[in-house]
């Protein structure tokens, strides 16, 4: 038995007046530190067992309290060892030795239901629309739970709701089922799947959008077409029909997020056709490159700060440009060149680029050299961010188009030789222009 389990046990006492057995007041932090430390060193595979350390903490916390209730709070370490091993074996056999439970997570997203399919794949699960009556039943169950602060949480939400919270046409209500051994794993896994799915949806919906240029004489903030829809404001978690807990997820939930609309709202059925990728794919694989770049794209497309948005897109370009070393000027050039080639590959080698797209690319070409010399201190404005997004658009679409057909070596070779071909074409075009 890890001595930290005994240290945690020693911080349990029996209240003199009520006889309640609990962790001593003022000892909660030390109790938690010891218990979590011992649990982490058990080395259980989170995804294999579909558990979290937090779920294990809850089980072992309950187990130590039960031992203290049955055998007292003054056992020696040797006396505790036998009782603890019995309790630990029970936890492992009765909990880890049986199939995981099914948890149901319901949540709102700020998209009109008519713009969202009835069902969307989430790699290992699916998100299904529920109607307003079903949503209201779940909402009431959470509001009426005496042990939950959800009712107070709802009062803090900023959006202009109708008479009943969240009951309005701008919202879609979704339900996802997830196999898990504790509610924390269910929440963790579903939030991962929702994050990558929204990254995929946002990517295809915002493809080739470059934003609107800021008028030179105006102090007005530029109109942005990009979405802030990064994750639901909260999840409600249920098991066997009973409300378990809620979890706020969008940590800007107190700030009004306004309405969200798809650029391609008429193409709602196409959302179901958008490919899904494994959130847990090895980062060194072709699929892992796509997932990492999609998450960088999601950060960029939902980030308010132009500067932070730019560097999120830039991180995606670094991943997909497939260069070996980003610390020198030549590889910064490779990153931009390969991004430009991927972009032009989808636009008939530059002939069909809209004027605002060309301006954005010119901005990023100028910025690449400052990034080498000034690094993170360099000034970033909207045009640079737009250019970085477009380069990532081109690279991501190319990777997704060739998914299942090419490997990383194939892609690297295509980008390398594509840039060389493009440079030769540009050289010949310039030469012929000069001669004429």
What do the predicted segments below correspond to?
Residues 59-311, 315, 385-436:
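Charged, non-catalytic interaction/linker regions at domain boundaries
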Residues 286, 299-303, 350, 354-357, ...:
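Residues at structural and domain junctions
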Residues 1-93, 326-328, 340-342, 352-367, ...:
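Polyanionic, low-complexity intrinsically disordered segments
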Residues 307-313, 322-342:
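Short acidic alpha-helical/loop segments enriched in Asp/Glu that coordinate divalent cations
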């Amino acid at each position: 038995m890890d001595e930290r389990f005994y240290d945690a046990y020693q911080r349990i006492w029996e209240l003199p007046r009520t006889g309640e057995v609990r962790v001593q007041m003022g000892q909660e932090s030390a109790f938690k530190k010891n218990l979590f430390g011992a649990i982490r060193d058990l080395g259980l595979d989170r995804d294999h067992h579909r558990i979290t350390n937090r779920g294990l903490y809850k089980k072992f916390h309950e187990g130590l309290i039960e031992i203290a209730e049955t055998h007292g709070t003054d056992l020696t370490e040797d006396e505790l060892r036998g009782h603890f091993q019995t309790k630990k074996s029970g936890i492992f056999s009765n909990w880890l030795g049986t199939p995981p439970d099914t948890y149901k997570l319901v949540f709102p997203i700020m998209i009109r239901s008519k713009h969202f399919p009835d069902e969307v794949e989430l790699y290992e699960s699916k998100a299904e629309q529920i109607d307003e009556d079903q949503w209201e039943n779940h909402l009431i169950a959470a509001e009426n739970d005496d042990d939950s602060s959800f009712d107070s949480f709802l009062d803090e939400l900023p959006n202009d709701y109708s008479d009943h919270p969240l009951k309005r046409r701008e919202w879609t209500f979704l339900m996802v089922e997830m196999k898990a051994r504790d509610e924390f794993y269910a929440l963790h896994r579903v939030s991962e799947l929702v994050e990558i799915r929204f990254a995929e949806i946002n990517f295809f919906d915002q493809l080739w959008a470059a934003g609107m240029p800021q008028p030179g004489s105006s102090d007005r903030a530029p109109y942005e077409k990009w979405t802030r829809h990064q994750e639901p404001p909260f999840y409600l978690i249920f098991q066997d029909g009973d409300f378990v807990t809620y979890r706020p997820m969008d940590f800007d939930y107190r700030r009004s997020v306004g309405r969200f609309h798809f650029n391609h709202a008429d193409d709602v059925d196409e959302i179901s056709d958008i490919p899904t990728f494994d959130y847990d794919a090895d980062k060194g694989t072709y699929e892992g490159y796509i997932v990492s770049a999609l998450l960088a794209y999601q950060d960029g497309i939902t980030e308010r700060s132009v500067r932070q948005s730019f560097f999120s897109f830039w991180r995606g370009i670094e991943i997909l440009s497939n260069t070996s070393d980003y610390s020198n000027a030549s590889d910064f050039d490779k990153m931009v060149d390969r991004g430009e080639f991927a972009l032009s590959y989808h636009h008939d080698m530059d002939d069909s680029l809209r004027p605002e797209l060309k301006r954005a690319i010119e901005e990023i070409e100028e910025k690449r050299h400052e990034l080498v010399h000034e690094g993170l201190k360099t000034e970033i404005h909207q045009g640079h961010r737009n250019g970085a997004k477009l380069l990532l658009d081109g690279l991501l679409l190319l990777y997704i188009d060739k998914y299942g057909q090419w490997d990383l070596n194939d892609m690297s070779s295509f980008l390398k030789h594509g840039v060389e071909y493009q440079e030769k074409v540009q050289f010949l075009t310039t030469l012929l222009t000069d001669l004429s």
